[in-house]
């Protein structure tokens, strides 16, 4: 069995972003039910030197849109990091999902050998399209989605594994 670059990337990222929206929705409902200021969750961290929830969402969405653009050879859209409410974070995630859905398989498939260079603080890092997807994008994306889940769970939001995995009959 083989899997295409498109199948291994955009549908996976869209599902992860959809699940992240669900997780944030549960946190928003929890805040309303318990009469907790939602900004408490938006600013929450697992540890003082770790990034807050809001930054986890910024990075997850930036990773997803950057993946689609780089694999397709397109310009990466810039999103200013200004969202500070659950509604604004939902809108950012939806904008990213809509962007990912604007690509079709033909734009992504065949990108396995595309040269991708990331400008990092430590200097440029070079990848092929396949190594970029498998060794950078997917681990980085899921690290930040998982950390968002962990921050909210640690903050008392009633979340379970199916909230993270997306137990809404999308496994086909």
Residue ranges and their predicted role:
Residues 20-34, 148, 152:
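Long, well-ordered alpha-helical segments
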Residues 65-106:
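Helix-adjacent hinge/juxtasegments
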Residues 31-42, 102-133, 165:
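Acidic interhelical loop/turn segments
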Residues 153-172:
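C-terminal end-helix/capping segment
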Residues 3-26, 39, 46-69, 94:
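Aromatic-residue-lined binding/catalytic grooves and analogous aromatic/hydrophobic interfacial grooves
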Residues 2, 78-82, 130:
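A short, mixed-charge helix-start or loop-turn motif at secondary-structure junctions
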Residues 42-76, 125-159:
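Short, contiguous alpha-helical
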């Amino acid at each position: 069995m083989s899997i295409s670059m498109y199948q291994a990337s955009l549908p996976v990222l869209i599902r992860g972003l959809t699940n992240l929206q669900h997780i944030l929705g549960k946190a928003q409902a929890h805040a309303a039910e318990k009469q907790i200021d939602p900004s408490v969750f938006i600013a929450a961290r697992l540890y003082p030197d770790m990034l807050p929830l809001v930054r986890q969402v910024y990075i997850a969405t930036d990773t997803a849109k950057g993946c689609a653009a780089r694999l397709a050879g397109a310009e990466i859209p810039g999103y200013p990091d200004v969202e500070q409410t659950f509604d604004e974070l939902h809108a950012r995630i939806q904008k990213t999902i809509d962007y990912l859905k604007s690509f079709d398989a033909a734009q992504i498939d065949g990108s396995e050998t595309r040269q991708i260079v990331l400008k990092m603080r430590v200097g440029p890092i070079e990848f092929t399209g396949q190594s970029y997807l498998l060794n950078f994008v997917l681990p980085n994306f899921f690290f930040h989605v998982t950390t968002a889940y962990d921050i909210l769970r640690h903050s008392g939001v009633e979340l379970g594994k199916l909230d993270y995995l997306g137990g809404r009959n999308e496994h086909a």
